[in-house]
Amino acid sequence: RYTLAAGRTGTLYGIRADYTLVFFNNPDCGMCERIRAEIVASPLLSEMIRAGRLEVLALYPDEDLTAWRAHAPQVPSSWINAYDAGARISKEELYDLKAIPSMYLLDRDKRVLAKDAFEVGYIECLLDRQPQ
């Protein structure tokens, strides 16, 4: 479960797209900014987002909501920008986050295609090889 700025919640299973890219990030993380820029600059990912085939969930797994809210304008409006209320991800070890940033690529049924990825090129290669 994730929480949006207005307080509304959602789940991964509520995301209706062929693929979901869960991008775990922190507001003051330089590497996170680089990866965000690479996702935005990727012709493949941009086209898939535009076509509704890929949804990006930018998920902040920590509890400093002041920093997260201040950083929100930097996240593209076409992405879901959310945080983990109560820091359940880390407390309950819902994801094996070895480092931030990290990306998980999920298919339509939310099966994991990539875990702990930190290279946008790797995500592009995986998506490029998937059946249309």
Language model segments and positions:
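N-terminal "domain-start" segment that seeds a small globular fold
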Residues: 1-14, 125-128
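Hydrophobic beta-strand positions
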Residues: 1-2, 24, 105
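Short acidic-hydrophobic, aromatic-tinged amphipathic segments that line or gate anion-handling sites
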Residues: 2-4, 80-85, 116-117
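Short active-site neighborhood of thiol/selenol oxidoreductases, capturing the structured segment around
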Residues: 10-39, 55-59
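Structural microenvironment flanking redox-active thiols in thiol-disulfide oxidoreductases
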Residues: 33-73, 87-93
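Short, internal strand/loop/helix patches
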Residues: 69-104, 108-109
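Non-catalytic, surface beta->alpha helical segment in thiol-disulfide oxidoreductase systems
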Residues: 98-132
